[in-house]
A protein has these predicted regions:
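Buried, small/hydrophobic-residue-enriched core segments of structured protein domains
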Residues: 4-47, 97-106, 115-119, 124-244
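Low-complexity, highly charged intrinsically disordered N-terminal segments
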Residues: 36-90
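Glycine-rich, N-terminal phosphate-binding loop and its surrounding beta-alpha-beta segment
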Residues: 66-127
């Protein structure tokens, strides 16, 4: 396989983007189960408020439109047969989605507005299947959807820092300067291009200073931003200075 072809292989089959144990959960629900309704909340921690952000990115990138094919289902079946054992994968369930829904996922996902601050122990997002034959699908998607923890965490922490800095500016500075008081230089400090993009985008909810280009691009591509959401300046580094 050429490098260019393998670049995005981990996200090219949605059926395999879940935890292994979920492959067998379709067998474990009580007979007659038709609908499963699940929700996401922040149980609490060091902050009393949670800033919700990042869901739209995951919906548009992974879940919207025709996202499952027969080829995906067969690949997943072969994988699970070897990974867990024959007969453990829900071939008919996934083929039902391919044949009857054109590869679209029969679920409804609702959420609070992105960027909003919500008290902990409140619902942030819900998901429910709309086809009674796909009761197993609701929590199958949990693995992917819970990745919102990262942009939520960045947005919440960044928001708390903004409040702390703003308090000090009111005491001994100029509150009008708050948007540029915490600059994001995190591009090189995270584990992937996707992490950089969604993390930096979350930070830009609260501040406007960033050198993480990926965050601006995420907002432009997945949030239809028409404005320049982040700003930087001409600046030097060691190599340009020590060269003299």
């Amino acid at each position: 396989m050429l490098k260019t072809e393998s670049r995005d292989f981990l996200s090219r089959n949605l059926v395999l983007q879940t935890d292994s144990y979920k492959f067998t959960h379709w067998k474990q629900y009580p007979p007659g189960t038709q609908y499963v309704y699940s929700y996401l909340e922040s149980r609490g921690g060091m902050f009393s408020q949670t800033v919700f952000f990042g869901l739209q990115y995951y919906l548009l990138k992974y879940l919207c439109g025709s996202v499952v094919t027969e080829e995906d289902v067969m690949e997943a079946r072969d994988f699970v047969d070897r990974h867990i054992g024959p007969g453990m994968f829900n071939v008919e369930g996934w083929m039902h989605i391919v044949r009857n829904w054109g590869g679209r996922l029969p679920v409804v996902i609702k959420a609070v507005p992105e960027g909003s601050s919500v008290s902990v122990q409140n619902v942030l997002m819900t998901i429910e299947n709309t086809d009674p034959a796909c009761y197993w699908l609701t929590n199958y998607l949990e693995t992917l959807l819970l990745k919102v923890w990262y942009p939520i965490t960045v947005a919440t922490l960044s928001h708390a820092i903004r409040k702390a800095i703003l308090d000090k500016l009111h005491r001994s500075g100029d509150p009008a300067l708050i948007d540029f008081k915490l600059h994001d230089f995190g591009y090189r400090g995270v584990s992937s291009e996707e992490t950089a993009g969604i993390g930096a985008a979350a930070h830009l909810i609260n501040f406007k200073g960033t050198d993480t280009v990926a965050g601006i691009r995420v907002l432009q591509e997945f949030y239809q931003s028409q404005e320049m959401e982040g700003f930087s300046i001409p600046a030097a580094e060691h190599s340009t200075i020590t060269a003299w």
